[in-house]
């Protein structure tokens, strides 16, 4: 039987979504160390910190997926953010591996005891590594190496999924106060607290990958700020403990952790009656990691099989309005930033440290957007496997509401939402949160309408990939 030329052309045109009948679904795993040298500037706070020790190493972990025609790699990186270098790292990994740049999904765990990378303002892009540090250049080599290891490790695989909960370790950090205001981190036992504003997402999602002739892979998803340790020592914080817990209990299993929307959550329980009197700054990160990892271990044997299928991927852009200040606000913003840079934190407006930090964040935002833009092109990254699994990447720190909404509305059997993927536009509050004041909203580059644009944009992307499965 002859096949018409037009049919052949049509098949070729959609080859990105076609899997040969003989093709096998395959998954690979790669890991590289990305620990910086001592003396490195650490990121996460509004003051300078130089690394003077190492509590535990930092990793770049890659999971590669192939359907025989299409390949994609999902990466988890123990770094707070790649700031302006995200595109350069993504394109560099693609060039080193032969992947489509849109098939490279780089997610940062957001540890606050890791190196400062791509130092520039939120939403800015750096065009080259010309001014990069030796570490920043070496980091590209390590990311590319982890991806190549994963692609070279591809083996026939089957998927299973399960969900559970890790309760009592993640808390909304924005609170309604008795005077009607909204405050971030108001302090443990503050008598003026009325209630948290928002809903903590305590769900643990597990993707079990069983491979022929090679170690299985556990992909664990939870959502909370990794900011429990502080100080000047390098650490991946509790996400590393999640991985260590899973790998130490389950036989012949490699683990990767993906942090979800965490912009308004952290580990601090402000209610003294509900706080454990035995947890300290030195132990809370281990407790969190063991609890999340323990839930994943408990779910391992309960994972239900799901059908695998075509590997899809996409980076789509949505246009979102920026939060520009008024011209009359510029002089005060310049004064506040100058005070902060000169170390005169006490002179910055505000009665508490958090209020002063909020003033700094707002001033920086006003100065950054003084000359525009009025709108940002906001990249949304997605990797999908058949009808079973979707990885949704948001380039910033979305509030937990984003993940809760997308998990409920996604057409895929399991949707893993990830923060700080292929970009960093700072805090991404929900539309409801934009009606409040506070650290995250006053410093955000955006205004109300952001959540709708991102969630609806991602859902359109998911529906498109789902139909082309």
Question: In which residue ranges do the predicted regions lie?
Answer:
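Bacterial N-terminal signal peptides that target proteins for export
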Residues: 1-10
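Bacterial N-terminal signal peptides
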Residues: 9-17
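Sec/Tat signal peptide C-region and signal peptidase I cleavage site
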Residues: 17-23
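Conserved beta-alpha junction segments in alpha/beta enzyme cores
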Residues: 23-287, 300, 307-469
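Anionic-ligand-binding alpha/beta catalytic cores of soluble enzymes and soluble regulatory domains
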Residues: 292
């Amino acid at each position: 039987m002859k096949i018409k030329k037009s049919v052949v052309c049509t098949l070729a045109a959609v080859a990105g979504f076609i899997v040969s009948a003989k093709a096998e679904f395959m998954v690979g795993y790669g890991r590289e160390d990305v620990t910086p040298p001592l003396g490195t500037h650490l990121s996460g706070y509004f003051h300078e910190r130089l690394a003077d020790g190492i509590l535990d190493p930092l990793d770049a972990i890659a999971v590669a997926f192939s359907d025989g025609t299409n390949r994609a790699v999902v990466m988890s990186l123990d770094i707070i953010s790649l700031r302006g270098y995200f595109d350069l790292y993504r394109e560099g990994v693609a060039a080193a591996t032969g992947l489509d740049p849109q098939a490279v999904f780089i997610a940062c765990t957001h540890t606050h005891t890791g190196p400062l990378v791509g130092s520039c303002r939120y939403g800015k892009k750096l065009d080259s590594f010309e001014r990069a540090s030796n570490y920043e250049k070496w980091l590209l080599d390590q990311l590319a190496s982890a991806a190549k290891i994963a692609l070279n490790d591809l083996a026939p695989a089957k998927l299973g999924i399960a969900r559970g909960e890790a309760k009592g370790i993640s808390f909304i950090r924005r609170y309604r106060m008795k005077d009607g205001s909204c405050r971030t981190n108001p302090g443990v036992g503050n008598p003026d607290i009325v209630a948290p504003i928002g809903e903590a997402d305590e769900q643990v999602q597990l993707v079990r990958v069983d491979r022929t002739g090679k170690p299985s892979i556990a992909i664990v998803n939870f959502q909370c700020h990794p900011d429990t340790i502080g100080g000047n020592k390098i650490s991946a914080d509790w996400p590393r403990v999640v991985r260590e817990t899973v790998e130490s209990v389950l036989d012949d299993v490699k683990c990767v952790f993906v942090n979800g929307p965490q912009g308004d959550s952290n580990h601090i329980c402000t209610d003294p009656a509900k706080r454990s009197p035995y947890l300290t700054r030195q132990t809370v990160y281990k407790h969190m990691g063991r609890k999340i990892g323990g839930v994943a271990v408990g779910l391992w044997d309960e994972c239900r099989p799901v059908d695998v299928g075509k590997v899809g991927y996409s980076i789509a852009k949505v246009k979102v309005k920026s939060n520009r200040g008024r011209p009359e606000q510029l002089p005060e913003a310049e004064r506040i930033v100058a005070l902060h840079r000169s170390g005169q934190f006490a002179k910055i407006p505000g009665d508490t440290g958090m209020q002063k930090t909020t003033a700094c964040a707002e001033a920086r935002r006003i100065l950054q957007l003084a000359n525009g833009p009025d709108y940002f092109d906001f990249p949304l990254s997605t990797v999908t496997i058949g009808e079973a699994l979707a990885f949704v990447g948001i380039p910033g720190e979305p509030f937990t509401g984003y993940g809760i909404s997308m998990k409920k509305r996604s057409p895929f059997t399991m949707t893993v939402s990830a923060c700080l993927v292929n970009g960093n536009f700072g805090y991404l509050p929900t539309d409801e949160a934009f009606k409040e004041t506070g650290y995250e909203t006053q410093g955000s580059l955006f205004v109300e309408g952001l959540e709708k644009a991102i969630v609806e944009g991602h859902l359109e992307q998911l529906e498109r990939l789902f139909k082309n499965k």
